[in-house]
Amino acid sequence: MIKWAIIFFVISVIAGLLGFTGVAAGAAGIARVLFYIALAIFLIVLVFGVLLGVLVF
């Protein structure tokens, strides 16, 4: 998921440099959502790993 967030971030930067502000804003929004979803999943797995004391993966 982080890979897709980075891809959409790069798309938004390139689109912003070329003047396509609508595309840049859309891609940046998608990248932000994917990043926060990946961060939430990471934190949930981290908390379960610490609380249960087992290796999750």
Swiss-Prot record:
A Pfam family per the record: DUF1328
Keyword Acetylation recorded: no
Membrane-traversing stretches: 4-24, 37-57
Gene Ontology terms: cellular component: plasma membrane
Compartments, as annotated in UniProt: Cell membrane
Predominant location: membrane
The keyword Ribosomal protein appears for this protein: no
Position of the signal peptide: none
Keywords per UniProt: Cell membrane, Membrane, Transmembrane, Transmembrane helix
Bilayer disposition of the protein: Multi-pass membrane protein
Record family assignment: Belongs to the UPF0391 family.
Stated name of the protein: UPF0391 membrane protein AZOSEA39630
Taxonomic source organism: Aromatoleum aromaticum (strain DSM 19018 / LMG 30748 / EbN1)
